[in-house]
Amino acid sequence: MDRTDIAHLRRCIELARAARGGGHEPFGSLLVGTDGTVLQELTNTVGSGDVTGHPELALASWASRHLTPEACAGATLYTSCESCAMCAGGQYWAGIGRLVFALSGEQLADLAGGTTLRLSSREVFARGNVPIAVDGPCPELASDAASVFEGLWPSS
């Protein structure tokens, strides 16, 4: 993980804060192309009533509709918290070649008091035959990434 990765993760954490401020769960993600251009950035929209309104899944859907398979393979999905099994599956099927996250799913589960599905993105990707690189969690940003959840659950 390099400085550019960390800068993108910081933006994801900002997006997560914005999502929470808008009445949604605090998750933010962005998709970066092979040339380093930010292609899309999204926040969680579960508060609108759609439990699948995760930004990673929406970005995977966008990528599969707007990018070539080669562009997807060279793209990186950055997210404030490790993608859940649903979102990792979406990334796999879209063919997005790399995932980078600040906070791990296990760290999130500890904050949430165990209310999450404990299946890491690495485990999801390992079941497929298309390699997807995974970088995370980011110790440098763990505290900041966790802070967006303060007071959201009784254990946080």
Where are these regions (language model features)?
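Short, flexible loop/turn motifs enriched in small residues
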Residues: G22-P26
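Small-residue (primarily alanine) positions within well-ordered alpha-helices
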Residues: C12, A16-A19, S29, Q40, ...
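Short beta->alpha transition motifs characteristic of CBS
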Residues: L39-V46, S104
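Conserved redox-active cysteine motifs that mediate thiol-disulfide chemistry
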Residues: C81, A85-A88
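Zinc-dependent deaminase
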Residues: M1-A18, G90-S156
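Immediate flanking context of iron-sulfur cluster ligation sites
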Residues: P69-C81
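Short beta-strand scaffold segments in enzyme catalytic cores
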Residues: F27-G36
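A short, polar/charged loop-to-alpha-helix boundary motif
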Residues: S48-A58, W62
